């Protein structure tokens, strides 16, 4: 499973998204890891994964205590993306949509920034570095994260009060299992990436 400890603090982060938006109209700065060793690129991928995990935790702060919560949190023992949505649904009947939208927007921007950087690492590994195996791992990681995000979003949608009565328990269980399997696959890809990167250097 992916945890916050997967990140190694030895690699500096890319300038924040706020700094990038302030620089509109100016030429975009050079990518800071252009000539970095492969090991550093792999460490950065792990840091980006930790940032994604943090984004999922922010979404968790907005989920409702619907009946499926116990099965989701305890029975399956999965890090969920539910707290954010829980807070939103608890704010009903006069839902605090503006705050929820703000949280989702912030998380979406963080995910988009992480995705852009992951794609840049993939291009660097697949192009100038001539490491197609490592680039393939990075691409797989990106695809798995897209699957995870889409599945979590669908789960959140299915748990809204308006749809809770129409909830299909079997479908919910399938989606929860899909999240688990996707997270396991992400962990495997990260391990393969680290192992193959050590062999490449």
Curated annotation (Swiss-Prot):
Domain of life of the source: Eukaryota
Originating gene: REX1BD
Species: Homo sapiens (Human)
Protein name: Required for excision 1-B domain-containing protein
Pfam families xrefs: DNA_repr_REX1B
Region (Disordered): 1-28
Compositional bias ranges of the Low complexity kind: 1-18
């Amino acid at each position: 499973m992916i945890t916050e400890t997967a990140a190694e603090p030895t690699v500096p982060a890319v300038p924040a998204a706020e700094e990038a938006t302030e620089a509109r109209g100016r030429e975009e700065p050079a990518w800071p890891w252009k000539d970095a060793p492969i090991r550093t690129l792999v460490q950065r991928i792990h840091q980006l994964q930790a940032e994604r995990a943090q984004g999922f935790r922010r979404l968790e702060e907005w989920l409702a205590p619907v009946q499926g919560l116990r099965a989701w949190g305890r029975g399956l023992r999965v890090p969920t993306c539910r707290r954010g949505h829980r807070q939103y649904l608890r704010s009903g009947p006069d839902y605090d949509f503006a705050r929820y939208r703000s949280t989702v927007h912030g998380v979406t921007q963080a995910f988009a920034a992480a995705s852009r950087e992951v794609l840049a690492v993939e291009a660097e590994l697949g192009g100038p570095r001539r490491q197609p195996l490592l680039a393939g791992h990075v691409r797989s990681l990106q695809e798995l994260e897209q699957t995870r995000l889409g599945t979590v979003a669908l789960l959140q949608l299915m748990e809204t009060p308006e749809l809770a009565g129409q909830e299909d328990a079997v479908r919910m269980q399938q989606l929860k299992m899909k999240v688990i399997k996707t997270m396991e696959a992400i962990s495997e890809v990260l391990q393969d990436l680290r192992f193959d990167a050590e062999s490449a250097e």
